[in-house]
Amino acid sequence: MSQEQAALEWLASLYSVETSFWDPVNHRVRQAAPETLLGVLRALGAPVERVSDAAGAGRARLQEVWRRAASPVAVAWDGTSAGVELRLPASCGDSAVACALRLESGEERRWVTELAGVTAEEASEVEGERFVRKSLPLPGGLPWGYHRLTAEIAGKPHEILIISSPVHAYLPPEGADHRWGVFLPLYALRSERDWGVGDFGDLDTLMRWVGELGGDIVATLPLLPCFLDEPFEPSPYSPVSRLFWNELYVDVPRIPEFEHCRPARALAASARFRRQVESLRRAPLVDYRRAMALKRQALEKLVKCLFARRGERLAAFERYVEAHPILQDYARFRAAGERQRRPWTAWPARLRDGDLRAGDYAEDARRYHLYAQWQAHEQITALCGGGRANGVELYFDLPLGVHQDGYDAWRHREAFALEVSAGAPPDPVFTSGQDWTFAPLHPERLREQGYRYVVHTFRHAMEQARLLRIDHVMGLHRLFWIPHGAAPGEGAYVHYHPEELYAILTLESQRQGCAVIGENLGIVPDYVNPTMSHHHLLKMWILQFELQSDPRAAIRLPAADQLAGLNTHDMYPLAAYWSGEDIRARQRLRLLKPEGARRERADRAAITEAVGMFLWQDGWLPRPSGKPTDIFAAAARFLAASRAPIVVFNLEDAWGERDPQNVPGSGRRHPNWRRKARFRLEELPRRTAVVELLGEISRCRRSAGVAG
């Protein structure tokens, strides 16, 4: 290794960047290219243009680390902290530190610590100067919360965020386990009253039906706002923001204003409007642009009626807006974007830099977004409250990132590394790697900002949810960063501060009474699952990943801390998996080479035969069968009787659906996030086989709870 390469790898280590990763496709350790490391390091703030800059940048980084004086964040688990990390010149290592701690409640505590009585944990010489590392003790018994410590060191004040958090995330009380539920994307729900896309009213209908069958949970995809005009990106995993809701799902006739708003009612009753609704309703795929445009026409009339009547409802609206100040900012951003019709990075400088004024947008558009968010909030709140009253909870999903042209990346841009994309290295399914196209969060700037954006993100979801899935939970530890312009597999892992992120997650979880499920699928480092267990996060168990070709042990059993399911939204339904349709489709989409397809088909044939034998021998099938609907029914009963605390089934598996909702890596070659369910909600109670199977699942779950 050359001296310059060694200096580059040293610099990477100082920024917590891994210089290599395991390539499971070629079964070897793969080194990140120098150009990749330079791009990632620049995104982290390192002053490097070429490899020859690494040595000087490393020396500067080392000085920065040791001259920081105080870490910007410290964690107190269950009220007790190991202290605040201090890095000081040895000449200041024995000085007195005046401390003022302001608790979240407003209470203040003051004390002075003599560092002469604190043992140094490390010593180092940097550019000829000696430094020491010590821990500044904190008082014990701190209440939960986000507290602010001001530590005056050598005459200079330093602000430190103290996160006092429970070690464990919230879990439901004993007796609330052995629950079951179903999954369907909200956009896919069909009914006799929908406007071309499922809405919160349809979700309410589904929740009530599941509750009548003894179910406890309805899971769906993220319910966050998306770009549905220009720009256009309907993926629920690329939202405009993780701090607001998707107005597409508002059930317009349920809005109180609708009853008294003649213009809105006249619009909805007009022949032209009804023809458009019927056209959207009949289509097998969701037409997001048309559906959103249609719904917006009605919402705009409702907001005008609200302001014209000037009654208690207007007062309630104004109270809501006043209580949510960032909503005003969001509405201005969306309204300005509609006028500009281009990404915020291409806006005039003042707007791009976050200074929006009244003339920069249409006032009607601003009011529309305020009103649409209020209605989305009201309907989700009613949905969650009503569902809990009926014993059914919504299982929310929090995506890993946001659209790079969206509100969060604009207003909270310092929290993001906008020069790179998050993704994943090559794996057996995606042999070229994946570029997810959104900007990852910046680990150091998050700390400097006191994790404000992360706190608001978790809190927004947990205020409504009682079950929250964290997409790609490995992202609390590290993420694969890909410099812009590089191929998907040409990235490097960047590490975060997991203790601090878990502290925020468990604190918000306990405060809101929301259990957390971590999506730990794919490439999972050895330290992730033990950390999840330590903090009482539920893991995921997916049948298609737990199958093997031994008929005596064809299915690995789920554990008592795993949410179990047959598949995910990124996988083909069970019937397609069973017939190998997923393999053929990936070949057509050029996501799988012929040799890999032959190998997968052979493996799949051995697995499906073994699973059929296993389910028959174990008593879940009355006779050996390879029919997908039989396998689904048997596997569903098998999982329902397991010790998994929660089991969630893709409802479409119950009728043998073969088309997936999403094919990762397919881009526009597949209608991702658009396919509607085969049956309307009104038809489901008449699907005798489905109703009987869900009834069996419910009985198996209750029996497992009694036995367990």
Give each language-model segment a name.
Residues 1-47:
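Basic helix-extension-helix modules of the SAP/HeH family
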Residues 23, 153, 184-186, 219-224, ...:
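Glycine-rich, histidine-containing beta strand-loop boundary motifs that form or position
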Residues 42-111, 121-151, 164-412:
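Acidic/aromatic-lined carbohydrate-recognition and catalytic surfaces
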Residues 106, 230-381, 401-646, 652-653, ...:
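Alpha-amylase-like alpha-glycosidases and glucanotransferases acting on alpha-linked glucans and related
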Residues 154-159:
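Short acidic/polar inter-strand loop motif in beta-rich domains
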Residues 656-706:
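Structured C-terminal cap/extension of enzyme domains
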